[in-house]
Amino acid sequence: MATTLVTVRYPLTADSYRTIERGLDGYEDGDSLIILHVSLLQNGDRISRGKLQAAVEAEFGEIPAHYVVRRGYVLEEAIVDEAARQNADHVFVGKSKRGRLRRWIGRLLGLYPDIEAELAKNLNTKLEIVD
């Protein structure tokens, strides 16, 4: 059983749809699929899991996913925290988030690591970038 974390923006964008599609591509019965939106506190966003689920299901129909909305100030921190919390095997992010994740982890660790290598080493997680 694999756990896949798919990060999206709300309202959903074209990048969000592509990221969800990639997460669904590898889904098998018994796997855990988690759709994550980080609601940034500094933006005053207040998105409910129900709204996120309704938006995803309007495009993809009912899918076997858990919907999570995290609130935080730092997008990258919330994604890494949720990946660790869920013990994710795969994390799918849009290409625009890759650079931000790399910089955030670089600041956190005092260097600029290969984000894929760091997630694989420290969390046993595979990161996939969706173009």
What are these regions (language model features)?
Residues 39-59:
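Short, surface-exposed acidic-centric catalytic microdomains
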Residues 17, 73-77, 113:
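Structural motif corresponding to alpha-helix initiation and N-cap regions
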Residues 2-46:
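Small/aliphatic-rich secondary-structure junction motif
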Residues 21, 54, 80, 117:
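Active-site phosphate/pyrophosphate- and oxyanion-stabilizing loops and adjacent acidic/basic residues
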Residues 90-131:
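Gly/Ser-rich helix-loop-strand patches that form or flank binding pockets
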Residues 1-16, 117-131:
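Intrinsically disordered or low-complexity boundary/linker segments at protein termini
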Residues 61-98, 102:
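Mid-chain, well-packed structural core segment of small domains
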Residues 34-36, 66-70, 128-130:
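General small-molecule cofactor/ligand-binding pocket signal
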